[in-house]
């Protein structure tokens, strides 16, 4: 029983990290040469999720520089569509895990009530 709560809490922490990475990517999308990051989830033993933050090194688009006509700088490699998908899906996954914690809590409460009789 308790393992379900641990798994859900681990997922909540991981989703919080993914949301933080997404927010950082969006905040820096107009920064020259910024490289986006990605939160990668991996199964943790015995229960839960490990998160690895990886920097994505793909190049952005070339932009004309303000320093001169012959100079070129690089845009960020942030894809706003990808980041918006994260902003939509993460809260739904977060809510689902919260419901899981609540259900486990109610089940444990019921079991304790039965044992207490």
Regions found by a protein language model. Give the residues of each.
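Amphipathic alpha-helical polymerization modules
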Residues: 1-117
């Amino acid at each position: 029983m308790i393992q379900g709560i641990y798994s859900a809490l681990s997922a909540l922490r991981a989703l919080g990290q993914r949301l933080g990475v997404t927010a950082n990517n969006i905040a820096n999308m107009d920064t020259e040469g910024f490289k986006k990051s990605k939160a990668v989830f991996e199964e943790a033993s015995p229960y839960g999720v490990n998160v690895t933050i990886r920097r994505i090194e793909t190049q952005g688009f070339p932009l004309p520089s303000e320093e001169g006509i012959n100079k070129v700088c690089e845009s960020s490699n942030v894809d706003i569509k990808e980041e918006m998908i994260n902003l939509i899906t993460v809260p739904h996954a977060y809510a689902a895990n919260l419901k899981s914690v609540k259900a486990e809590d109610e089940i444990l409460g019921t079991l304790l009530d039965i044992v207490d009789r």
